[in-house]
């Protein structure tokens, strides 16, 4: 008996074709729809002639919809691509509204190739692409670390913002404090240096140098005055003399008879105790006050007296020498002698328009012209003492040019306690100090220009005018000092 041949392994049956591809194959091969959809001449693609009519007339017969866009999307899902011809690729729209699609496995007459047409499936993640737990944990740790760094950075940023605001507020405060300190320093500088820049015309808080002449080897103590009111009648004349109290005893101390002493006195120093001046009716006597004063004996028993020059706007305070008998003074006042009380003034000075007007003087009250001392004072007052004194240490303020000069003072034996010339206003009558400059040719070289004082005496009787009461003598020309002032220069 013959054995049957072994059965060959059967090939697997054809895979089922998707319904969309079967319907599309039938639709394209149907001759009744060639006017709307057909094969291309090459047979590798198919054409859709009129898309709108195709969507309305053909699609509902094979599909459940009549949407051309859905039909095109399904073709793309199976791998069909739209063929763009040269006509359709231009900018101008072609006359025929048709579209062509093609697929390598969709060919006319080869239906078996439809099995190769597969629907595009989204790519699935393989095992290698999945997250492993350890990787996920590491990633979460890194995210948490980044979040912590971010939080710390934000906290630091907030702190920096707060510090920045605080610093700006401090800067504003410091600017305000700096401006206030700058203004205060400016005011202080103005108060300190303003009077110096303003010049001598401003007498307001400016400390002016004052010169005081006193006899002795050291600077004298402040002048002591007897408490005695001045009569109102005596203040009517620019210069007057008031008798001292009976108990006043003055004398020169032996150790203070060396010569005059010049010391610095502040302008705003308080007035001597006990001195009272009645104010002038015209209010102008408050400027410039020259005092001819006396110093009583010191508690130790040594009497001190001297000439004190304290200029206030070119005015001077003069301390009188020890007293002499009253008879000599009365003889002078009664006119006993070879002079007239008004003679020297009328002979040497031009007649002023005002009773108090005095000829023009220098910046410190010195007259510019020379006058003969013989014509200004009576002979009894023109007897200089034989002794001479040298200026003490305080003369150093006058400059080195005045050191070593000698001065002689006339001994006036007059009992008087206070001689005060009142100058009503600056620029009006002032105390004329004929300077301690060298005499002009033809005059006595041992005799300096006199210090003229208009004196009104009050010796128990009516007040009498006295044109001259004091003369300061200087040594010969080679040893004569110029006027006591920092601006003066020694006479040639």
From Swiss-Prot:
Q: Which residues carry this modification: Phosphoserine?
A: 298
Subcellular localization(s) per the UniProt record: Nucleus
| Positions of the DNA-binding region | 17-121
Give the keywords, sorted.
Answer: Activator, Cataract, Disease variant, DNA-binding, Isopeptide bond, Nucleus, Phosphoprotein, Repressor, Stress response, Transcription, Transcription regulation, Ubl conjugation
Cellular compartments per GO CC: chromatin; nuclear speck
Task: Write down the Pfam families for this protein, in alphabetical order.
Answer: HSF_DNA-bind
- Entry protein name: Heat shock factor protein 4
What does the entry's PTM section describe? Answer: Phosphorylated mainly on serine residues. Phosphorylation on Ser-298 promotes sumoylation on Lys-293. Isoform HSF4B is constitutively sumoylated. Sumoylation represses the transcriptional activity and is promoted by phosphorylation on Ser-298. HSFA is not sumoylated.
**Annotated spans, Hydrophobic repeat HR-A/B:** 129-203
